[in-house]
């Protein structure tokens, strides 16, 4: 694989957008160097350093994987679970992880945080098809993508020098993601990995449901589910007890119930670490606030008629990485 050593000249800029008008740092996700600089800036106040060499290599490799430049794999062809979807986990995960460290400084260690960051990059790699898999898209693996992500992580991470124990810890954290993670079946090797696994699962839910374009993107999610339904077949769906939505409008109408009964329960079961995202001065959780606004848009039927078609273009190459207004979360002990 050929990677450009040219340093990105894209300058991060603050823009007023979403989350009640709070400021967010917006970075171009086309640049692995920009993403690494953001991680380095975020974790700079911790008393230890992570291995940025391996993190940068992983960022470049996963970007190559999603773009079809990784040996043995096709490009990502799932329009909902894309590269931007993966990178959106960094802000809430990092804020929760740093808050956890400030509460339990002896629990969150350098290697644990490093593997947590790597797990973000790897957690949806199971959607990527291998070369020779020419039927359909990666969406067909929706109900099996976690196992496939674990398999990819176990194959890939040794190339960065990680050992079997590291692979096991990454597997445990990957299994904290998804709609209904079986948390009680995960034998975490340390309290730190358990907490970071919960941080990852929490970030996975909140980062997508708080997306300002979430309601529009549900049509893309339904397209993925539709292919997954067909690939699994009715018998397998029955065994998995998977709810089948009749249309994307049906999916949208069930979303408030999903957030309240399924996602809400999941967030509580993961140690309620979502509370660490609250602003210490106002008590406002900007992620939950945006999720609630999205749910309100559904229940009040204030969704524009044409919102179901999500436009692809320049906006998809940018991702909101961190809110300036939440920087206080990096300084205080919650």
What are the residue ranges of the model-derived segments?
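His-Asp-centered metal-binding catalytic motifs of divalent-metal-dependent phosphohydrolases/nucleases
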Residues: 89, 113-132, 149, 171-180
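Secondary-structure capping and boundary motifs in well-ordered enzyme cores
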Residues: 81-85, 108-117, 141-145, 191-198
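Divalent metal-dependent phosphate-bond-processing catalytic cores, especially two-metal-ion Mg2+/Mn2+ enzymes
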Residues: 2-48, 95-112, 122, 179-334
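Active-site flanking loop/helix segments enriched in acidic
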Residues: 63-91, 132-139
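Structured all-alpha helical bundle cores of eukaryotic regulatory proteins
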Residues: 130-153
